[in-house]
A protein has these predicted regions:
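Catalytic-core elements of nucleic-acid end-processing and repair enzymes
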Residues: 1-306
Length: 306
């Protein structure tokens, strides 16, 4: 994995271009795609270094995972009108993710500019102190075989883990998923010992890149895609390293997905993004298209005009 420190927008673009060109020059076998994840700071508190492990929100905190079904059901109970258009559990998780709920999704994007916007943005929480801290852009190579659509059996099964208590989850007996999944995919099939079921048992213990339905305004504006995390027995978290050394390892949860580089984006580069925010089209009102962020943008734009 390569590291670089970026002090300007030009540094970021140049480093990503060089990194992807270098990676393409090597043989990986099969088609690949490149994805980016922007973070405005190390959310675990370290100012200067990126996180070694990238984890979804539901893994952050000792008790969140234990109460995953309660979090899921409370969101539906309190804001049913927000989810009325969502036809699958994955679509519900997508909407929850974009509004800051802890889920088993990790945001990534195929567009570098969106990742840069995430580095600059203060997100849903508006923490101004993050402007004075290093941000990070993680660059991933993803084998095309590790990319799924939101309607696949694998994604349906992994998404419905959010509805089920930890002590009910046993990888060798996934029959408990059948009732939930058949509501979304009538052809969902589970039979002990079948080839399809054996494959699903392996798939549930992996991380997958998922392309969502573009029926969510934030997904549309952000070109948002996701890493969807499965689990082991009793919902024990995956050790998702995204290491290049495990890219071809069928035993690894991150088989076919490698983090090939990390760019450290300094506060100086963040300031330059602020100066060119409209030109780059990476303002918060673009990434988070709602009344609150749009009104804040207008306040900043016109509040100090002389």
């Amino acid at each position: 994995m390569k590291y670089a420190e970026c002090h300007s927008v030009a540094d970021i673009v140049r480093e990503v271009f060089d990194l992807v060109q270098w990676d393409r020059s090597r043989s990986h076998g099969g088609r690949v795609a490149y994805y980016f994840r922007g973070e405005n700071a190390n959310h675990e508190g370290g100012d200067d270094v990126p996180r070694d492990l990238l984890t979804p929100g539901i893994y952050r905190g000792d008790s969140l995972l234990k109460f995953e079904p309660e979090i899921f059901n409370e969101a539906l109970r309190v804001f049913p009108e927000e989810f009325v258009r969502d036809r699958t559990t994955f679509e519900i998780l997508t909407r929850m993710q974009h509004y800051g709920y802890p889920t088993r999704l990790l945001d990534v994007t195929s567009k570098l500019m969106t990742a840069m916007g995430m580095v600059r943005s203060q997100g849903n929480r508006g923490d101004e102190t993050r402007k004075r801290r290093n941000g990070f852009i993680h660059v991933f190579r993803v084998n095309a075989d590790r990319i799924k659509y939101g309607t696949s059996d694998t994604v349906t099964a992994l998404s419905n883990l959010a509805r089920i208590k930890s002590d009910h989850v046993t990888i060798e007996d996934l029959q408990y998923l059948t009732a939930e999944c058949k509501n979304e995919r009538a052809g969902f099939f589970w039979e002990k010992g079948s080839q399809t079921t054996d494959a699903l048992e392996r798939d549930v213990q992996k991380v997958w890149c998922v392309r969502p339905m573009v029926n969510n305004i934030r997904v549309n504006f952000q070109a948002g895609e996701f890493f969807l995390f499965g689990c082991h027995d009793l919902k024990k978290p995956l050790q998702a390293t995204f290491a290049e050394s495990e890219y071809d390892d069928s035993r690894s949860p991150t088989e076919g997905i490698a983090r090939i580089g990390i760019l450290t984006v300094t506060p100086r580069a963040k300031e330059e993004m602020d100066d060119f925010v409209e030109c780059l089209d990476i303002g918060d009102e673009r990434l988070y298209p709602d009344f609150a962020h749009h009104s804040e943008m207008l306040r900043e734009r016109f509040g100090n005009v002389r």
